[in-house]
Amino acid sequence: MRNRAGNVRGRACRSWEGGALAAGLLALALLCGCAGRQAAPAPTPDPAGEPASAPVPALPKASPETVARHEPTPTPEPTPFSIAWITDTQTMTMYPSLAPALLPTFRWIAQSREEYNTQLLIHTANFVENGWNPLHWKRINPAIALLEGELPFLPVAGNHDVAKKVLSYEPYLAQPFIAWQAPERQYRGGEGYCERFTAGGTDFLVLGLGYLSVNEAGLAWAREVFRQNDDCVGILAVHSYLSYGSDRTSELTGHGALLRQEVVAPCGNVRMVLSGHVKGNALRIENFDDDGDGQPERQVVCMRHNYQQNRYPDQVGYLRMLIFDPVSRAVSVLTCAPAQGSFTAAPDRADEEHFTIENAF
């Protein structure tokens, strides 16, 4: 079956034609020592509380026609591809001594697009320490500008971006990268955003929802977009989802509990949730029984990754490459710091920095 853009759509892959990229990504997974590792599912705990958000007006329903596809060129064959993921860059905008890491980090993301077959960069918020401080935006915007015309970008607003002075999207929505967005894919002018693309023979819908929009109207918009694009593998990108816990289990934040109940659970195509906010790394894998037959049909992978200078004094410019294998349906996670030339896991954090998740999409 083919979708409206003429790209092959489907979840099953017939074969994998090897090549330099495929071999390289497989070698990378083996080098990381992560092939076949999977965390155990975690039970659903009582969520921690989180401040309530002000209500916003609901938007008209989204439709597949309004969720237009973006560059890069789709890859209909089952070829490995990647999504780049960065979060909580706030300390690099706050401290002049750390700000020089921003340009090389974003430059590497843009320049490595072909090598990793990168389809998208997701930023799960807290771009800056204080969204009302123009100097902080001045430090990061030149780095983000390197992506323009090079790589699709899905930003999410966090509490530091919109809530340090008053609860308002005003400083965030004034940033240049919001103007890159297609209006038909925005929620309330950039408070939320979605990207639909085809890679490895599979259609994906990635949806980002800002920190102040985790409320009745914002949740309804997210739910409707996922449901109108139920032919896609869904990825939800938010700032706050996983709370404190061990590196392999985690409770939910207040926002996380709402998002799980109102979006993740009812939308049967959501397979992954990415978040930051809380410092450190966490992984939570949960199974959902969507048809009520007593047997889980859907695995949802939830990850948090947040390297900040005050948690890891020598670690700045960290990001994750999520490497999708469309044949095995596994995702290999590579945590790296290109600005430092670091692509190997720290010995004391190897299991949480380089690993593979089976049945991930």
Model regions: which residues?
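N-terminal active-site segment of His-dependent metallophosphoesterases
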Residues: 46-135
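Bacterial signal peptide processing site
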Residues: 35-37
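Active-site neighborhood of phospho(di)ester-bond hydrolases with catalytic His/Asp-centered motifs
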Residues: 85-87, 120-126, 152-159, 209, ...
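Active-site-proximal beta-strand elements of phosphoester/diester hydrolases
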Residues: 80-93, 202-212, 235-237, 299-306, ...
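A short C-terminal boundary segment appended to hydrolase-like catalytic domains
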Residues: 77, 320-361
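C-terminal motif of bacterial Sec signal peptides marking the signal peptidase cleavage site
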Residues: 30-33
